[in-house]
C-alpha cells in the first residue's frame, strides 16, 4: 500500500469539534444515540470467539466507554493527538494510543473484531482505509456511517448546514445503505448483518 501523505488530505480531523458527540442532552438526539448503541450491541452479540477488539477513531473515547463492558482485550486509537489524553482519561483501564487508520500499528491478522464508528465518511480514501483494516483484522468489522440522503434531510429539517444542503462539516463521503453494503463487500468481506437506526447504517462483516 502506498504511504498516505496526511498533509495533502482534505480531511482535517484536528480542526473538527467532537466534544459532546454522544452526550447531547436534547431528548430526540439522546433517543437516537441510544438506538445507535443498541444496534452496535446487537451486532457485537452476533460475533463468535472474539478474544480481542480494537476501535479506530475513538475521538474522546465516548463510544469506547459505552462498549468496553461487552468486549475483552479491548483497545482504542485516535489520529488527533490532543484527543488521545482525553480518551485515556475516559478509559484509564484500556490501551489507548495514537495512530492513523491508513497506517495501523497492529500486526496482520491480529484483531478478532475491529470497530470503526462514524469515521469512514470523514476520510479522503475510504477504500485504502478498509484495505488497511482488512490487513490487521482476523475476523470481523463493525462499521457505521450516516445513512444518506436521510442524514442531510434531517439536518435541513432542523435548519442545520443549509448552505451545504444539510451536509455536516467534515463529511466527505455519502452512502445509502445499499451503496455502503457494496463498499464493504468490495473492500472487506461478507456482510453478515445490517442495522439501520435512524439516521445511520451499521454493518457487521466477516473478512474474506
Where do the PLM segments sit?
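Conserved N-terminal segment of class I S-adenosyl-L-methionine
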Residues: 1-108, 130, 159-188, 193-208
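Hydrophobic adenine-recognition pocket in adenosine-nucleotide-binding enzymes
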Residues: 119
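A short, conserved alpha-helix within the catalytic core of class I
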Residues: 123-132
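Short aromatic-enriched loop/helix-cap "lid" or pocket-rim segments at secondary-structure transitions
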Residues: 152-157
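Conserved beta-strand signature within the Rossmann-like core of class I S-adenosyl-L-methionine
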Residues: 138-146
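Short "lid" loop at the C-terminus of a central beta-strand within the Rossmann-like core
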Residues: 147-151
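A conserved beta-strand element that flanks and buttresses the S-adenosyl-L-methionine
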Residues: 115
Amino acid at each position: 500500500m502506498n504511504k498516505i501523505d496526511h498533509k495533502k488530505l482534505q480531511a482535517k480531523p484536528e480542526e473538527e469539534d467532537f466534544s459532546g458527540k454522544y452526550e447531547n442532552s436534547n431528548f430526540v438526539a439522546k433517543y437516537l444515540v441510544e438506538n445507535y448503541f443498541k444496534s452496535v450491541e446487537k451486532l457485537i452479540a452476533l460475533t463468535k470467539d472474539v478474544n480481542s477488539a480494537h476501535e479506530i477513531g475513538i475521538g474522546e473515547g465516548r463510544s469506547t466507554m459505552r462498549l468496553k463492558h461487552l468486549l475483552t482485550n479491548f483497545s482504542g486509537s485516535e489520529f488527533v493527538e490532543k484527543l488521545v489524553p482525553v480518551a485515556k482519561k475516559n478509559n484509564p483501564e484500556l490501551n489507548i494510543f495514537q495512530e492513523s487508520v491508513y497506517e495501523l500499528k497492529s500486526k496482520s491478522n491480529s484483531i478478532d473484531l475491529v470497530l470503526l464508528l462514524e469515521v469512514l465518511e470523514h476520510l479522503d480514501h475510504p477504500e485504502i482505509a478498509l484495505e488497511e483494516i482488512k490487513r490487521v483484522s482476523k475476523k470481523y468489522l463493525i462499521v457505521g456511517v450516516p445513512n444518506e440522503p436521510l442524514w442531510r434531510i434531517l439536518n435541513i429539517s432542523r435548519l442545520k448546514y443549509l448552505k451545504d444542503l444539510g451536509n455536516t462539516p467534515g463529511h466527505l463521503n455519502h452512502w445509502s445503505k445499499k451503496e455502503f453494503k457494496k463498499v464493504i463487500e468490495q473492500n472487506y468481506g461478507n456482510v453478515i448483518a445490517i442495522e439501520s437506526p435512524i439516521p445511520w447504517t451499521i454493518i457487521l462483516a466477516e473478512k474474506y
